[in-house]
Amino acid sequence: MKQTIILLYGGRSAEREVSVLSAESVMRAVNYDRFTVKTFFISQSGDFIKTQEFSHAPGQEDRLMTNETIDWDKKVAPSAIYEEGAVVFPVLHGPMGEDGSVQGFLEVLKMPYVGCNILSSSLAMDKITTKRVLESAGIAQVPYVAIVEGDDVTAKIAEVEEKLAYPVFTKPSNMGSSVGISKSENQEELRQALKLAFRYDSRVLVEQGVNAREIEVGLLGNYDVKSTLPGEVVKDVAFYDYDAKYIDNKITMDIPAKISDDVVAVMRQNAETAFRAIGGLGLSRCDFFYTDKGEIFLNELNTMPGFTQWSMYPLLWDNMGISYPELIERLVDLAKESFDKREAHLI
């Protein structure tokens, strides 16, 4: 009997378009000799829509439902996704997706799911909290200032200018895919950047800009996590924002990255240490800055990285000899392993 994969996609965050791309890639790559795929779309308003089922490979003309093509007659209760023995693959990015909320819902339903658990998902989603945890693990990061809604913005800007030097990067603390990120060269630009970031979150991070290459490492596993050789993001834009990643196609990837073996070893070790520090499970992508001075800074951990067939994370594992379809199978098996362990602890 085939294993059912419940594919959750869409979502309420600004990254819902990325989720659709990732989900369509997964549905086309699944090994249909082993799996059946059932898809549920989460609308921008948070409603669950039962969409398609696939027992064999979809045709090129098959497309998943989006906010523009919703069939509201197929709206269901969120709990309708439950199916005994099924594994959920929540291809959801950003808040209300990879921040622990969906993970908690799936644990209430007693369903295995791909990826990090409630704690590690919510922790890694918040950039400020992640930085504090990684500091305790002894992992180097770029200097930063945290700003929370209600703070005296003028005083915080003064703190930024005392501790950091322009240019700086301003980021919503609880957002991914470079949504809401701005580069500032002066105080006026910083004020505008803060306004933009606060549109997406009530906690904002201001980081020191560094002249650095962007290097990424893939992680796969539960308590026995393994890492990939690093890949490099090669940009034709000022910084790696949402449009550059997913809309304008202004980036290329160099896999494996052209860096020394010593640097590779440090990055892989730091990535695995960071994954363990947050209690990661299943998968993550760890992003580093490698400066022209030879400094290695961990930038962020992404617990549900972009998962299209052309995204960095699957390509990193492909370089290690694990194909995209095989990667999906391994993640499903890891999900069942972590579920069994979680259930065994409930005594």
UniProtKB/Swiss-Prot annotation:
EC class of the enzyme, as a word: ligase
Cofactor names: Mg(2+); Mn(2+)
Residues the entry annotates as binding Mg(2+) 2: 300, 302
GO MF annotation terms: ATP binding; D-alanine-D-alanine ligase activity; metal ion binding
Biological process annotations from GO: cell wall organization; peptidoglycan biosynthetic process; regulation of cell shape
GO cellular component: a single term: cytosol
A Pfam family that the UniProt record links to this protein: Dala_Dala_lig_C
Cofactor note as given: Binds 2 magnesium or manganese ions per subunit.
Pathway: Cell wall biogenesis; peptidoglycan biosynthesis
Presence of keyword Thylakoid: no
Catalytic activity: 2 D-alanine + ATP = D-alanyl-D-alanine + ADP + phosphate + H(+)
EC number annotated for this UniProt entry: 6.3.2.4
Domain of life: Bacteria
Domain ATP-grasp as annotated: residue spans: 131-333
Keywords tagged on the record: ATP-binding, Cell shape, Cell wall biogenesis/degradation, Cytoplasm, Ligase, Magnesium, Manganese, Metal-binding, Nucleotide-binding, Peptidoglycan synthesis
InterPro entries named among the record's database cross-references: ATP-grasp, ATP_grasp_subdomain_1, D-Ala_lig_Van_CS, D_ala_D_ala, Dala_Dala_lig_C, Dala_Dala_lig_N, PreATP-grasp_dom_sf
Main location per the UniProt record: cytoplasm
Keyword Metal-binding set for record: yes
Binding site for ATP: 161-216
Localization annotation: Cytoplasm
Residues annotated as binding Mg(2+) 1: 287, 300
UniProt similarity note: Belongs to the D-alanine--D-alanine ligase family.
HAMAP family in alphabetical order: Dala_Dala_lig (MF_00047)
Function summary: Cell wall formation.
Name of the molecule in the record: D-alanine--D-alanine ligase
Species of origin: Streptococcus pneumoniae serotype 19F (strain G54)
